[in-house]
Amino acid sequence: MVNFKNTIRMNHPYLLWSLLPGFSLFTGCTVSPKKEVIKSDDRLPNVIYIFSDDLGFGDLSCYGATKIQTPHIDSLAAQGAQFMNAYASSATSTPSRFCLLTGAYPWLYENTEIATGNAGMIIDTACVTMADLFKNAGYVTGAIGKWHLGLGGPNGPDWNGEITPSPRNIGFDYDFVIPATVDRVPCVYVENDRVVNLDPKDPIFVDYNKKVGNWPTGKENPELLKMKSSHGHDNTIINGIGRIGYMTGGKSALWVDEDIADTIVSKAKAFIAKNKENPFFLYLGTQDVHVPRIPHPRFAGKSDLGVRGDVILQLDWTIGQLMHTLDSLGIANNTLFIFTSDNGPVIDDGYIDGALENLNGHTPMGIYR
């Protein structure tokens, strides 16, 4: 599947080339000793790597979209290097992310297909990852947003206790993640190995084979849905939306779909501000424009392309917020900002949300259709 591009914001081009040779060290998910952190007096460039979700080459105005405008992402393209012929390692989420972080072809490894929400950690903790390379070079490392690479041991995570292994076992100093995808249970955030806001008196149970608890499902109670499914996505209902998989418990920890982008941005801003005096690497996976597409009210109805267009606007806002944060902290000129997508566009991916009907001449595939 064709990926749309990488756009790199840089005021000093040599920073890009000084960074890239480090990535040439990737030879696959080898089991190698973790090296000691390299100390240096030189100020290393901060690196922010944005992995958007299911975004197409033709979804951005800097790539010719005329039905929607993405000014903040366009600004990145104008200031940096805009790739016109880049490719994703895989056409789906989990294997694409696995390859990015490990440098390994996912089809050579077991369990790298699309992960369930209760899958164990897919990346071996002995593997040297991209995060390890940054950490060894003296960076503070963070993973925020969509994860979808499994958590916990071979039998999956303990949602009610310490969740390990986690991103913090493969090179990240800090994590605040969506365990899988926003259409899969559990619909909770995990921060530094613990479910956020979990009430121990209301433990979480998750199953992908059979129903657990008595929470309604899309199949049994379609009248409770605010967004109906076109195929699948009819298991446990969370926030009026049928999900893949079953869960019960953890009511105080459940996310609100309309607020996910704001939450991710808030956590990213806090990480950047906290580490403004240190070189940092931030890996940020957005939930946009993956299903279910539930934009914040600020963006609902603001595009001419229905909810899929609305969440593209929300994604562009996300990038703008991060750019503004870098500018306000005075570190934009020393930050590499890389923006790409995990794979190409998906239009109808399980919900009746009008995405196909509201294209109005918009072509997410762009020139690759």
Positions of the model-derived regions?
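Formylglycine-dependent sulfatase
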Residues: 24, 29-369
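Bacterial N-terminal signal peptides that target proteins for export
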Residues: 4-17
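Secreted/periplasmic carbohydrate-active enzymes, especially glycoside hydrolases
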Residues: 1-2, 31
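Sec-dependent N-terminal signal peptides
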Residues: 17-25
